[in-house]
Amino acid sequence: MCGIAGFFNPSADYTKEKNYRNHILEMMNQVQKHRGPDDEGTFLSPQCGLAHVRLNIIDLVTGHQPMRRVRGDHSCVIAYNGEIYNAPELKAELISEGEQFLTSGDTEAILAGFMRCGPSFIKKLNGIFAIALWDESCQTLH
């Protein structure tokens, strides 16, 4: 079981208080550390902060989160907990459409699918999950 936490305000500029906001994200991870003792990470942008602790089960080496993906001028960041049962099929479909992957887990597949298809991609997921996905390009938290 992993843990996700964060904050969002479309009118904020959290980077003006970068040290303070990063400290809050780190404290969020400390509170939820029991949910994922193997790895932790944070992400901070002007309007969004994400914190993630991870229990390594799948993709032990390259599954660090929050995970960021960039395609051209479109970039997104995900903090995710769960298991996508149909991830291999979704990943194969995305590869056939030209996507390339740097990791072996389902996190990057969710991120790539979202970036290719938009929020409707979530309807294709078969599994148990909680997702916080920050679309940096349109400054929207999904």
What role is predicted for each listed range?
Residues M1-H142:
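N-terminus-centric sequence/structural signature that marks the extreme N-terminus
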